[in-house]
């Protein structure tokens, strides 16, 4: 179990996020981190995943890829970029009500849903046009089992643009999962990028992300 009491006495950082083991850990961590997450993490670490995932979405999306589901929406980093690009029908889903409160204040989402995506997602079958995610499929957060529910709620032909931490891509079964669902998805395109740009912390600079881009088969 994550020791969140000690976190109250020190600044929360990336190592704390990587220490997560259960959904309950995530709820506790982001409850304490929500109000300062953007400044403490996204800005200070020059976090690139929201920008990269939004770039790949814009590159591969069609007009029919709507509504967009932002998985692990957090404080709304991806939603903000997509909204600024003209997207208006964006649904944000996250396990942390405190993070969603921050996203709500920014006003970039048409709908916000508090849910654990490792369980049944409270959205209808074939109701989502595209799924994007930055920073959710990583150490101690969400594993590949979530793709079954995400495919259920996505329309046939719907676009997926998902960031996966490279260190867990094989170890945690993401590669195997894509092979197992190859009858349900198009051949994925994989693009690697740095999670953090030109950061003075060597550990941050070594974090690699795999953008996984595919569509649900018709």
State where each predicted segment sits:
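A short glycine-rich, Lys/Arg-flanked "PGG" loop and its adjoining helix->strand segment in the class I
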Residues: 145-156
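N-terminal auxiliary segments of SAM/dcSAM-dependent transferases
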Residues: 2-24
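Conserved Class I S-adenosyl-L-methionine
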Residues: 172-194
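Class I SAM-dependent methyltransferase SAM/SAH-binding core
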Residues: 69-120
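Class I S-adenosyl-L-methionine
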Residues: 186-218
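Conserved beta-strand signature within the Rossmann-like core of class I S-adenosyl-L-methionine
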Residues: 157-165
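Conserved alpha-helix/loop element of class I SAM-dependent methyltransferases that forms part
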Residues: 47-64
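A short acidic, Gly/Pro-enriched loop at the edge of an enzyme's catalytic core
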Residues: 121-131
